[in-house]
């Protein structure tokens, strides 16, 4: 595991957490477990029930929907949060392209962090709205 300072700096780069205080970043860090995944690991399987969200600390991953590549993600990306909010199935698959370090946060811990840091709710809504707009632009032009 990286030093506490560099780990918190990595979390600060996550768009969702960019306005969080150091104290809030420490809460987020404590809410999850760090995992190291080799290249080629299936992180999220489309259609499966989501039980956790993943924050990419280092490395890259590809998002595929129905087998079609829709995005490449890197440090600072959060994936899997949608299923945690609506208890629905995963909407895409995510596979690591390189060795990755991720913070894994369970549904219970994810919701507790949102409750403990109210500003995250607004930021999360803005992030999801941005994704909807991007999909709308891609689909309708």
Residue ranges and their predicted role:
Residues 1-141:
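Cytosolic regulatory regions built on CNB/CRP/Popeye-like sensor folds
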């Amino acid at each position: 595991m990286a030093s506490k300072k560099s780990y918190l700096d990595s979390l600060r780069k996550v768009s969702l957490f960019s306005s969080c205080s150091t104290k809030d970043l420490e809460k987020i860090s404590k809410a999850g477990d760090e995992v190291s995944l080799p290249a080629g690991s299936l992180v999220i399987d489309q259609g499966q029930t989501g039980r956790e969200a993943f924050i990419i600390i280092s490395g890259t991953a590809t998002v595929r929907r129905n087998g079609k590549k829709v995005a490449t993600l890197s440090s600072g990306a959060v994936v899997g949060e949608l299923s945690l909010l609506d208890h629905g199935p995963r909407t895409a698959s995510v596979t690591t392209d390189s060795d990755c370090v991720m913070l894994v946060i369970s549904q219970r811990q994810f919701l507790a962090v949102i409750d403990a840091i109210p500003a995250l709710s607004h930021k999360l809504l803005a992030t999801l709205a941005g994704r909807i707009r991007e999909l709308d632009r891609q689909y309708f032009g």
